[in-house]
Amino acid sequence: WRTRAERFDELVVDAAQDLARRWPPVDQIQFAVEEVPPSDPAPWERSVVLGRGFTAEPRAGLPARVVIYRRPVASRATNDAELADLVHRVVVEQVALMLGRRPEEIDPGSAP
């Protein structure tokens, strides 16, 4: 038996591993889950932030990082299948932004 939070974490890991098999640079990105964004959206972000990407900071020893926000993502899904699909799409979007690619290039099956 796993909690909802553990199942959500597993969905993020699965999406990241799936992308890393096809896009080796994804292996260099650290993935994390947080409950909610720590601040209000930046002016360029949509009203509710589902995920954020942070570039690597080699001087500080910090790898590139993608954070997926569990509550905003989970609140948009009505069932487990929708949740899995949405988590995958948010991970793809964030990875695409970090790699300077379109989401369709990263994962052709995730086009909106």
Regions found by a protein language model. Name each.
Residues E93:
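DNA-recognition helix of helix-turn-helix
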Residues W1-P58, A64:
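A metal-dependent hydrolase signature that marks the N-terminal structural subdomain at the beginning
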Residues V49-H88, M98-P112:
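Active-site scaffold of zinc-dependent metalloenzymes
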